[in-house]
């Protein structure tokens, strides 16, 4: 075979086990439905051990794209960190030990900041609790937590449970919760610096709602219809109303999120550059991150460093002299570039990246179409030229709108993708392209919890794999995301390298 291939990723389009709670099943998707009757298809595992995550852990876009591009199971930092937590060896990690020594010697405060939930997508509360226990063993006198509440990878009001658990653990280990801010502000990844500024000023200047009872303030927030993701900064005070802690020059700050993309902006504001419009100034801190957020960051220490993956699909295609396009809107652009390339920023020879801006709306239920039509309109002319050999295309809608939990909007998002996918596939088939249509994980397939409340998190459901080809209709095996790159190489007639341990699906 010597085909040209488009990998079309319908982000968050899982296979529902209960159609009643699925926006995909509720949506009118004549095109994707027609593919199931005409073309070979199978199911892929996109969560848990099959993608290098702990058993039962839902997949996510970062992990999904890494496995897709690598053509193998990529053992995630989460698994490595979990091992250190369960074996109680976090304190032996050299960068963490050095930071604790510095804090002790210099009498500096240690501030932990990150997402406090068991969602396991960006962070895990058990990691934080283990860090706090490790800090206690190191006899650090001043330890504070700046908690970001979740409500996106977990239920919208589960923050109360997690924060109660955290406060109890702090009481045991001598630490204190200093501030609480919703992830919408603290973990932006779309250059909404006005959001990031709220989190920055909460931690650095103790700006926010002052309270002697953080848990009660979270309850008050719920009563005002503000759920975890959107909680405005809450500042913990002592009995006299004085804030317990502010991040100050020379302090140790540890961002314990292990996923990289949503820790970058707050790290930039605290350590890399001044944002005068938002009155954010970088501080001289002893700053650590759980994993490497950005190779370009200066003076940021990394607790769990990872190496670039060799021989990803992009590198193999470069070696074969093939041209490739990576195309997505802002929200998923790092996924089709950095993560699909195994943690590499630099494009390969013959690689063109096409970016379209995600709409500037507060939440994507307000514009469920997002920028899917822009991607369609950008890619079709490229396919008509017949020059590019491989395309990695991501439609973000089912995932990004799925995270809002607004069912009718998610239905609209799914229908938008069905229409745009149809236009791209028809154009591609007319110009000799084959398509592998998949999802990287589920989301829109489970929109309602058993108690009737909206589900805003990813699912652990299987995802579809459809091979759309004008001529060849081989039987497709079921598999995992790490089998897709070998399948693409087989279609393209390019030899699979030994580093790719996944197997072609036909």
Describe the residue ranges of each PLM region.
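Feature captures the catalytic ectodomains and active-site-proximal regions of enzymes
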Residues: 1-506
């Amino acid at each position: 075979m010597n085909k040209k291939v488009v990998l079309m990723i319908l982000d968050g389009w899982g296979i529902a086990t209960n159609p009643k709670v699925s926006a995909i099943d509720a949506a009118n998707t004549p095109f994707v439905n027609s593919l199931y009757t005409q073309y070979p298809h199978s199911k892929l595992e996109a969560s848990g051990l099959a993608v290098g995550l702990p058993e039962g852990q839902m997949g996510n876009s970062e992990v999904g794209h890494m496995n897709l591009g690598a053509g193998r199971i990529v053992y995630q930092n989460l698994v490595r960190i979990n091992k250190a937590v369960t074996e109680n060896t976090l304190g032996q990690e050299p960068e963490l030990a050095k930071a604790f020594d510095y804090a002790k010697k210099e009498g500096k405060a240690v501030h932990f900041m990150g997402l406090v939930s068991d969602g396991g997508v960006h962070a895990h509360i058990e990691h934080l609790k283990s860090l706090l226990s490790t800090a206690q063993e190191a006899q650090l006198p001043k330890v504070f937590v700046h908690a970001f509440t979740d409500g996106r990878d977990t239920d919208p009001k589960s923050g109360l449970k997690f924060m109660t658990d955290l406060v109890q653990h702090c009481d045991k280990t001598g630490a204190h919760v200093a501030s609480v801010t919703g992830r919408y502000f603290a973990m932006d990844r779309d250059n909404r610096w006005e959001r990031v500024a709220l989190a920055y000023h909460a931690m650095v200047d103790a700006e926010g709602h002052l309270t002697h009872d953080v848990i009660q303030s979270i309850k008050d927030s719920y009563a005002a219809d503000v759920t975890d993701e959107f909680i405005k900064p809450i500042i913990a005070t002592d009995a006299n109303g004085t804030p317990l802690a502010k991040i100050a020059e020379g302090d140790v700050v540890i961002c314990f999120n292990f996923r990289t993309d949503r820790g970058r902006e707050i790290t930039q504001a605290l350590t890399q550059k001044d944002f005068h419009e938002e009155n954010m100034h970088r501080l001289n801190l002893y700053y650590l991150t759980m994993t490497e957020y950005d190779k370009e960051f200066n003076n940021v220490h990394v607790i769990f460093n990872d190496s670039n993956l060799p021989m990803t699909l992009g590198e193999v295609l470069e070696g074969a002299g093939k041209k490739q396009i990576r195309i997505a809107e802002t929200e998923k652009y790092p996924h089709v570039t950095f993560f699909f390339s195994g943690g590499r920023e630099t494009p390969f020879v013959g690689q063109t990246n096409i970016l379209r801006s995600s709409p500037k709306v507060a939440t994507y239920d307000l514009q469920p179409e997002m920028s899917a039509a822009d991607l369609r309109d950008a890619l079709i002319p490229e396919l008509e030229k017949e020059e590019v050999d491989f395309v990695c295309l991501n439609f973000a809608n089912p995932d990004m709108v799925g995270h809002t939990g607004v069912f009718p909007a998610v239905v609209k998002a799914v229908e938008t993708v069905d229409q745009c996918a149809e236009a791209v596939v028809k154009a591609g088939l007319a110009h000799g392209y084959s398509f592998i249509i998949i999802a990287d994980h589920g989301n829109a397939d489970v929109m309602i919890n058993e108690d009737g409340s909206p589900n805003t998190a990813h699912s652990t459901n299987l995802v579809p794999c459809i091979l759309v080809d004008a001529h060849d209709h081989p039987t497709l095996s079921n598999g995992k995301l790490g089998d897709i790159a070998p399948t693409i190489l087989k279609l393209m007639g390019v030899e699979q390298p030994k580093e790719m341990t996944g197997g072609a699906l036909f």
